[in-house]
């Protein structure tokens, strides 16, 4: 890591072509500057650190070997793109992942060097297949490069794409497997074992590089001799590599493994790949967090994603006097573990996100009752249906945005068979800095049309614990959704009605205005009701923790009201709004288009999902209704 905060070489780069004039010494210094810049910048804003530290040399070699944007580079997963952004002239990392700042993923809005905002894993090879096919048809002979890493090869889409790529090899497609042995944490499964066999064989890389060095010391004759026999050397050494067999059976040429932190070796490999001019796999071995000791010492995930940290230690930068708050994810993980201790039928399923979804403690206590299936959401859900068939109660812990990928399996494998599978949808609603692709706003629209499913949205830690205990005893499909971040303060009910409907504010005798608050929106709605009361307008706030299907008590309450207000943190979808027509309904939901990045509070305020905005809108609409009577 550089000791001086001087980035002269980095700051001189405005396009990838600027790299062409750099000397080897300057390139070495540039790698140092880039790595230090990433550490210092991401420490201030948070972001994907470990992954990007591992692709510094790879990104520079790619841009020196190919001609972006004419040769298009597609990253999978897209969070590996920070160095790519720097090389393509985007140096303003002060507002990385903040409102109006640089995206943490590739973005066409930022640069024509970015092809796809691919923050959902395993899609790049399908994109590369389509782009390369189109270029062949259109007579465009530029290269398409797919950089596939951070566990993306555990996703089925990659293999579907490889199946099609191998069937049509008349195109210039380079597939770079960035093999760091991890997704968030260590990559699991059979594919990972194939790749790990190569990574574990350090003698393989050493023999390849040593043989080249020996011949190079013989001068020009030695280098010519090596060029002539390197194929035989590679073939001999590849006999020790199971990875070569894995890819060669797909009838796609394989080159590697290559030391991903040796720029010279990378550029040589890419030169060979270009000469082949057909689909080829370049297997690159990298180290997540390379060059930054705190990342390498982080056994959990090599500082995959960080918040604001102290760059000298990699530790979270705590604010003086700040009290640590429980998170929704943490409360879920603790409660599931507690329930599993007494209910041996509870098992957990996750798609390469054991720690981010709160299952680490569960895995430590019950390693044989948790199943990490890799980045394979469709498989996770269908496998859970099989677990349920044998009498277990699987809890599928998944981010709301990734649930979209498995909708068919929810419908056809779980719901069609009435399987008692519980989906725990973390990061539901507005998530914040990861932007449009990570907001969990579509789950309500999708799941409300699934026959037989029950949907729950706890408002605080207590209702989350109670709800989790309830759904783990249900004999039907269920789903619980909660947002990202610190859990809300407990909001006790004033009174509980039948079917689990809680009254949070107001008198049940006054039904001029009934506010139906779903999940965490209960807090904003109670605040709105308090503000309305200050203006002499009385209202009742009810909170159905199980909000779908619609309860008769909810329908009975709203049928008598002069104004019905619905507040939920999701895109507008079928529900109460279909039951209440016309002026009597006022909805507070998330607009149905893609939402930008920014802090959760910033975005909720901009949308109008806060107590003050809700109160103003209710007051204006209620006055209209009164004046029209």
Curated annotation (Swiss-Prot):
Q: What class of enzyme is it?
A: transferase
InterPro entries noted in UniProt: Dxylulose-5-P_synthase (IPR005477), THDP-binding (IPR029061), Transketo_C/PFOR_II (IPR009014), Transketolase-like_Pyr-bd (IPR005475), Transketolase_BS (IPR020826), Transketolase_C (IPR033248), Transketolase_CS (IPR049557)
User: Where Mg(2+) is bound, by residue?
Assistant: 150, 180
Provide the cofactor note recorded for this chain's UniProt entry: Binds 1 Mg(2+) ion per subunit. Binds 1 thiamine pyrophosphate per subunit.
MF (Gene Ontology):
1-deoxy-D-xylulose-5-phosphate synthase activity; magnesium ion binding; thiamine pyrophosphate binding
- Kindly tell me the pathway this chain contributes to: Metabolic intermediate biosynthesis; 1-deoxy-D-xylulose 5-phosphate biosynthesis; 1-deoxy-D-xylulose 5-phosphate from D-glyceraldehyde 3-phosphate and pyruvate: step 1/1
The GO cellular component terms are: cytosol
- CDD domains annotated for this entry? TPP_DXS (cd02007), TPP_PYR_DXS_TK_like (cd07033)
Q: What is its EC number?
A: 2.2.1.7
An example Pfam family from this entry, by short name, is Transketolase_C
User: Which Cys residues form disulphide pairs?
Assistant: none
- SUPFAM superfamilies for the chain: Thiamin diphosphate-binding fold (THDP-binding), TK C-terminal domain-like
| Keywords for this protein | Isoprene biosynthesis, Magnesium, Metal-binding, Thiamine biosynthesis, Thiamine pyrophosphate, Transferase
- Which annotated residues bind thiamine diphosphate? 79, 119-121, 151-152, 180, 292, 377
Q: Which reaction does it catalyse?
A: D-glyceraldehyde 3-phosphate + pyruvate + H(+) = 1-deoxy-D-xylulose 5-phosphate + CO2
Extent of the signal sequence = none
Needs which cofactor?
Mg(2+); thiamine diphosphate
**Mind telling me which PROSITE patterns this protein's record contains?**
TRANSKETOLASE_1, TRANSKETOLASE_2
Q: Name one GO biological process term.
A: thiamine biosynthetic process
Task: State the similarity comment.
Answer: Belongs to the transketolase family. DXPS subfamily.
How is the quaternary structure described? Answer: Homodimer.
- Biological role stated in the UniProt entry: Catalyzes the acyloin condensation reaction between C atoms 2 and 3 of pyruvate and glyceraldehyde 3-phosphate to yield 1-deoxy-D-xylulose-5-phosphate (DXP).
Give the protein name, as stated in the record: 1-deoxy-D-xylulose-5-phosphate synthase
């Amino acid at each position: 890591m550089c000791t001086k905060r001087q980035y002269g070489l980095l700051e001189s780069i405005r396009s990838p072509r600027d790299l062409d004039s750099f000397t080897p010494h300057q390139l070495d210094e540039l790698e140092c500057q880039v790595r230090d810049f990433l550490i210092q910048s991401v420490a201030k804003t948070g972001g994907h650190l470990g992954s990007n530290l591992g692709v510094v040399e790879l990104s520079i070699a790619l841009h020196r070997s190919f001609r972006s944007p004419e040769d298009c580079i597609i990253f999978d997963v897209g969070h590996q793109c920070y160095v790519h952004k720097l090389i393509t002239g985007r140096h303003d990392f002060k507002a990385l992942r903040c409102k109006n700042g640089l995206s943490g993923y590739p973005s066409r809005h930022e640069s024509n060097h970015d092809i796809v905002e691919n923050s959902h894993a395993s899609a790049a090879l399908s994109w590369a297949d389509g782009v390369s096919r189109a270029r062949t048809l259109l007579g465009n002979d530029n290269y398409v490069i797919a950089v596939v890493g951070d566990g993306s090869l555990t996703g089925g889409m990659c293999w579907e794409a490889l199946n099609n790529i191998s069937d049509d090899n008349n195109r210039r497609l380079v597939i770079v497997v960035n093999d760091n042995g991890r997704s968030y944490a260590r990559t699991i499964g059979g594919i990972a074992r194939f790749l790990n066999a190569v990574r574990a064989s350090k003698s393989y890389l050493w023999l390849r590089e040593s043989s080249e060095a020996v011949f190079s010391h013989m001068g020009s004759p030695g280098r010519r001799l090596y060029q002539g026999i390197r194929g035989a050397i590679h073939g001999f050494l590849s006999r020790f590599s199971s990875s070569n067999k894995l890819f060669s059976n797909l009838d796609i040429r394989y080159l590697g493994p290559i030391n991903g932190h040796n720029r010279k070796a990378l550029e040589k490999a890419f030169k060979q790949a270009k000469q082949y001019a057909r689909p080829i796999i370049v297997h690159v071995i990298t180290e997540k967090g390379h060059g930054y000791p705190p990342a390498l010492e982080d056994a959990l995930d090599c500082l995959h994603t960080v918040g604001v940290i102290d760059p000298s230690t990699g530790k979270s930068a705590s604010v003086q006097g700040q009290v640590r708050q429980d998170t929704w994810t943490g409360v879920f993980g603790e409660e599931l573990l507690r329930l599993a201790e007494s209910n041996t039928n509870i098992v957990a399923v996750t798609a390469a996100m054991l720690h981010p979804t709160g299952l680490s403690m569960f895995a430590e206590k019950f390693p044989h009752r948790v199943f990490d299936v890799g980045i394979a959401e469709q498989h996770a859900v269908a496998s859970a249906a099989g677990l349920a068939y044998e009498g277990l109660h699987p809890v599928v812990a998944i981010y709301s945005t990734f649930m979209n990928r498995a909708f068919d399996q929810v419908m056809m494998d779980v719901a069609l068979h009435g399987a008692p599978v519980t989906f725990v949808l973390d990061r539901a609603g507005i998530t914040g800095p990861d932007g449009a692709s990570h907001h969990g706003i579509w789950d309500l629209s999708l799941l409300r049309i699934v026959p037989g499913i029950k949907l729950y949205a706890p408002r605080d830690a207590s209702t989350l614990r109670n709800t989790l205990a309830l759904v783990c005893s249900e004999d039907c499909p269920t789903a619980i959704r909660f947002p990202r971040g610190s859990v809300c303060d407990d909001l006790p009910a004033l009174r509980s009605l039948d079917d689990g409907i809680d009254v949070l504010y107001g008198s049940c005798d006054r039904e001029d205005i009934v506010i139906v608050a779903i999940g965490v929106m209960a807090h904003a709605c109670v605040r709105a009701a308090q503000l309305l009361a200050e203006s002499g307008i009385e209202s009742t706030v009810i909170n159905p923790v199980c909000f779908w299907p619609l309860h008769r008590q909810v329908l009975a309450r709203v049928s008598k009201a002069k104004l019905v207000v619905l507040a939920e943190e999701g895109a507008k979808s079928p529900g109460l709004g279909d039951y209440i027509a016309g002026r009597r309904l006022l909805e507070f939901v998330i607009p149905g288009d893609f939402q930008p990045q920014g802090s959760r509070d910033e975005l909720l305020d901009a949308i109008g999902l806060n107590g003050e905005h809700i109160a103003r809108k209710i007051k204006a609409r209620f006055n209209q209704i009164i004046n029209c009577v």
